Each structure stands twice: as structure tokens, then as C-alpha cells.
């Protein structure tokens, strides 16, 4: 262990199902082979962290949440040759893979049959230090702001990676539904991908903001029929659904043009879809599960090159419960980030 590394550190932990976070001091342990000890600079607070609190994915307790981690390498496991002390490093939702399953053999490491998830199946980044696996470690540029870029490791890579895999050519009409943590980034990425971007939201006061982020058109769905408005524009080649509003799924399908794709990035639960809305015009419904380490590096490099701005509110570690509550209430604009 490096001489500057302390023997103890603080972490925020869920001790039992449904409870709030407990801030505690614990002993620092060395990383094992294929592990990296990270001195955390910032960790985003994502709605998926609620899965840790409720044990929805079976991570158990106690558990430190957080999967939008940026920091510096404090120590490396035995035999490590790529990472060294002081390197800028990140940890995302994807926390590790076996490299042998069918998904891994196809390069979809974030879909691994035995995937580990930071902050869900292993302790995450609501802490001064955390340990991440080397195969899931993300190279982070030295010059980027840790708090601003931490959410890129979930919200950013999710919208970036999903949209690029839809293979929509530049110049096509792309609509973004929702202007929250995912949506405000999706608007910016879509604009920089070269699309004609339409923002869909239920609030007329957000139009100016949406246009500043890169929207060429704005549809207030509380005042205007989104189907008619999108069809008047020619029908969307892609609609990205970022807000969990199940009742809007069928109307969004009707807003697609011929061979249009509806990309669902928010978990809305069970929905009914009229298949007749799909078959006649070759429309389809898609989803995409975040990304692996290289995808995260691509999302960050693209954001850095094009000036994509993640809007955040910062909270110190001892205000972790306030940060979590603001995220759950939807009062934060637009991503809460815990800074050390």
C-alpha cells in the first residue's frame, strides 16, 4: 500500500432493505489480482442506485452503492501491468465479466451471463475509496472535471452507445422524449451526431432550454398531439424514450416514419403494444444496456471533443442522503454527484 494511503476511509452504505445510507469508517484493504484500488474524486447518484437500497437485483446487504465513479489509482493488484498509481480511472455500471460466455465472445461484455455491477453486486463509489475490476476499468482523461464527467459513465454512455447502435444516418429526424438526466444528454449527443433533433416534453417553459441543448424543434406534448406534430415533420427515424411514462409508448410508435425505431432507455414495466402499429410500416422497438469500458471511453471522448455538458448538483459525502433523496424526488437538475 502506498505510503500516502490511509489505513481507514469513509463510505456510505445501505445496511438493510429500504433503510437510508449510513456513513461509517472502515479499514482499507489492498486490491487482489485483477483489482484496482481507486481514490474516489466523484460518484454520480443514479436512479438505479435505488436497486441497491431495495435489493431488487439481489446484491444483499451491507452494500455501498454508486456506479458513476471517477478517481485516481491508489494501488493495484499483483501482476498488474496496464494501470499504475496516479492514473485517472473510472468505474461504470458494468463492473466485470467472465470473458467466456456467449455474450462476451461477441464483445457484449456488459451483457455477460455472470456480469458484476458496481454498486449492486459489489461495493460502489459512495466512498472515499473503492475497488474495481481491471477488465471493467475506464480510462479517464486527466483534464476533465470529475464531477461533470462521472454521470457520463451511466447516463452518458447509455444514450451515446444506444443511439450509435441504431445506425441512423446524419440528417435524419430524431426525437428525444424527456428532458431529465438522460434526456438532456441525449439531446446534445443527437445534435452532435448530425441529426435533425426534436425535443418532446410536457412543459412549454422548457423550450428555450431544449433549444440551447441542441433541439431544432420542440413539441409541448401537453398542448400538442405529438403524433400529428412528428408526422407533420415527416415522421421520426428514431425516437429515444428517456422518461418512464408507459402510456406514451404507443403514441411514440405512431410518431415514427417508415422503418422508424423506438429506442426505450427507461424501464417502464409492462406495456401493451398494438403490433399493427409496427408491421404495416416496418417499425420496431429497441433497447440497449449501457456499455462496457471501451464504450464508456468512447462516450467520454465524444463528449469532450464536442463540448457536451452534463448539468449537475454537487453534494459532499456527508450529505449523501440529501443527494439520494433529491435524485429520488426528481428535484435535482439534472444529475446529483457526490464529491470527496
Curated annotation (Swiss-Prot):
One of its GO terms (molecular function) is oxidoreductase activity. Zn(2+) 2 binds at residues 101, 104, 112. InterPro entries: ADH-like_C, ADH-like_N, GroES-like_sf, NAD(P)-bd_dom_sf, PKS_ER. This is Alcohol dehydrogenase patD. Zn(2+) 1 binds at residues 46, 67-68, 154. It is found in: Cytoplasm, Cytosol. Pathway: Mycotoxin biosynthesis; patulin biosynthesis. It comes from Penicillium expansum (Blue mold rot fungus). Keywords: Cytoplasm, Metal-binding, NAD, NADP, Oxidoreductase, Zinc. The keyword Cytoplasm applies. Substrate binds at residue 67. Belongs to the zinc-containing alcohol dehydrogenase family. Patulin was originally used as an antibiotic and specifically trialed to be used against the common cold, but it is no longer used for that purpose since it has been shown to induce immunological, neurological and gastrointestinal effects. Genotoxic effects of patulin with dose-dependent increase in DNA strand breaks in brain, liver and kidneys have been detected in mice. However, more recently, it has been proposed that patulin might also have anti-tumor properties. GO terms for biological process: patulin biosynthetic process. Its EC number is 1.1.1.-. Disruption phenotype: Strongly reduces the production of patulin. Binds 2 Zn(2+) ions per subunit. Gene3D superfamilies: Medium-chain alcohol dehydrogenases, catalytic domain, NAD(P)-binding Rossmann-like Domain.
